């Protein structure tokens, strides 16, 4: 039939990318505070290549980003919009698609490899995306005429790729990428990292502040609860104080929503032998293993290795193995016992391993199908929920007691960000902050939302102890199958480095 001319054969490439036309809408006008910040950013870009936008939570930074993107697109250039978490792309994609339609491309690791290859090839072709929205790996996409890079929530440590190689920090790498195109970089956050704030106030970066919340929404009221005394009095209901239980109950009666934050996934951070104190540790990393009840296994959260749960203690033979601490999995079980009628969801790495899992959890919460959302740091990162009136930070101490010079900075950032999810519209939100260390300066700084004081405290300490931003740290990692050879090589290398660098080598 083809030979007789009845049929004709056409070859058409069928891709996985959405190529249909989308109806777009006009961008929202900026309020006076946003307009002033927007003009200040443009002024900074006339003098500096990098600008830090320090805006409080719910101040409407995303609308400023959209106006800036539109200006760059009018000039015929491309935009890279970086986010720290895949979860954030779900909400922001809808906002950006309404404005930019199919000029917007999405890129992150939850897409299949074949789909990511198509995006890569599209960027190399003649019909490339003008705006790329993605996570840290997006910086490696090919661009032809990059004009602006936006790094939202620039303080997040998830921008740093640790393992596997290549090891890089997407914020710093994006600044280098922009310099290759002569493009500008906007760093946006409510809680800047100390290094970025130092660069801003020292004049290396431009600096713009946005201190008003959108539509005059009040900052949430943060109430401190000392759980150390309550635990001694045996008044705690699992990880929940009586005050938090009361507020959750009242919020549910008002048909409002609740977020419970605990930056530890799994059921229990560790198990321990009640008789001899033995704690199972990872054979690769030598850190305690986290118990996951749903999978009935022990998992190392550093390397991902899994172990069977022992029936008895291998050290003394006792069968009295106790769960110590609590993670999001246990919180989910406990809250269902207290509020059996509530609709509860959990958002952590274990429940969001697929591309659609994020979207379903967030969509259900937005549509009011979920009453209580339990989560790790995923719930703290820029998500907007209109009906959240109560946020519970279940144990602030777990964020503070890390052997890391950035632990207090990161604890402040996490608590301030998750507190910002409360009271989004028409009502001041309430944050219940549970801690055993109520007198720590960083706790007081969270309550008063005093970022400047946190910065000056941390900056003074780091200058004394020779930490960034005053010094740079280089970690040299050596590995060999024979320990004696490794020790000898490490000593020899340290001696050579000390001959040139002196006491700066540890």
Regions picked out by a protein language model, each given a short descriptive name:
Residues 2-14:
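A short, conserved structural fragment
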Residues 13-28:
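Conserved adenine-nucleotide phosphate-binding loops and their immediately adjacent elements
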Residues 25-31, 35, 39, 47-499, ...:
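Inter-lobe coupling/hinge segments of SF2-like helicase ATPases
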Residues 42:
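Short, locally clustered residues in the helix-turn-helix/winged-helix DNA-binding domain
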């Amino acid at each position: 039939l083809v030979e007789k001319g009845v049929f004709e054969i056409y070859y058409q490439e069928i891709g996985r990318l959405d190529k249909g036309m989308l109806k777009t809408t006009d961008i929202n006008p900026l309020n006076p505070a946003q307009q002033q910040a927007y003009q200040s950013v443009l002024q900074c870009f006339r003098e500096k290549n990098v600008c830090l936008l320090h805006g409080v939570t719910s101040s409407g930074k995303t609308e400023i980003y959209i106006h800036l993107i539109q200006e760059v697109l009018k000039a015929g250039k491309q935009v890279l919009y970086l986010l720290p978490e895949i979860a954030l792309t779900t909400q922001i994609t809808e906002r950006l698609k309404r404005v930019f339609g199919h000029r917007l491309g999405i890129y992150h690791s939850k897409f299949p490899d074949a789909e990511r290859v198509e995006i890569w090839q599209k960027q190399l072709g003649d019909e490339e995306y003008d705006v790329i929205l993605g996570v840290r790996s997006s910086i490696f996409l090919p661009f032809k005429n990059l004009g602006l890079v936006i790094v939202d929530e620039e303080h997040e440590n998830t921008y740093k790729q640790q393992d596997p190689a290549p090891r890089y920090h997407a914020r710093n790498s994006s600044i280098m990428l922009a310099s290759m195109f002569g493009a500008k970089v906007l760093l946006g956050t409510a809680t800047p990292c100390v290094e970025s704030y130092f660069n801003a106030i020292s004049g290396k970066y431009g600096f713009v502040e946005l201190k008003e919340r959108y539509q005059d929404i009040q900052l949430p009221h943060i109430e401190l609860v000392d759980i150390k005394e309550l635990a001694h009095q045996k008044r705690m209901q699992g990880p929940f104080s009586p005050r938090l239980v009361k507020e959750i109950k009242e919020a549910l009666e008002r048909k409002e929503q609740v977020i419970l934050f605990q930056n530890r996934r799994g059921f229990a951070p560790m198990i321990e032998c009640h008789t001899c104190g033995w704690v199972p540790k990872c054979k690769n990393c030598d850190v305690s293993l986290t118990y996951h009840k749903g999978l009935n296994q022990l998992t190392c959260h550093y390397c991902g290795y899994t172990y069977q749960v022992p029936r008895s203690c291998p050290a003394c033979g006792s069968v009295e193995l106790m769960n110590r601490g609590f993670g999001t999995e246990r919180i989910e079980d406990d809250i269902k016992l207290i509020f059996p009628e509530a609709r509860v969801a959990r958002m952590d790495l274990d429940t969001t391993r697929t591309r659609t899992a994020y979207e379903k959890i967030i969509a259900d919460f937005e549509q009011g199908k979920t009453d209580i959302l339990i989560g790790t740091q995923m719930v703290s990162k820029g998500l907007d929920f209109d009906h959240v009136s109560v946020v519970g930070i279940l144990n602030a101490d777990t964020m503070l007691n890390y052997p890391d010079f950035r632990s207090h900075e990161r604890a402040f950032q996490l608590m301030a960000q998750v507190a910002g999810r409360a009271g989004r519209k028409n009502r001041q939100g309430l944050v219940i902050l549970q801690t055993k260390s109520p007198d720590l300066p960083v706790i007081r700084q969270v309550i008063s939302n005093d970022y400047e004081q946190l910065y000056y405290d941390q900056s003074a300490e780091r200058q004394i102890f020779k930490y960034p931003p005053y010094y740079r740290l280089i970690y040299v990692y050596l590995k060999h199958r024979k320990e004696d050879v490794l020790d000898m090589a490490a000593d020899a290398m340290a001696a050579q480095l000390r001959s040139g660098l002196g006491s700066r080598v540890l």
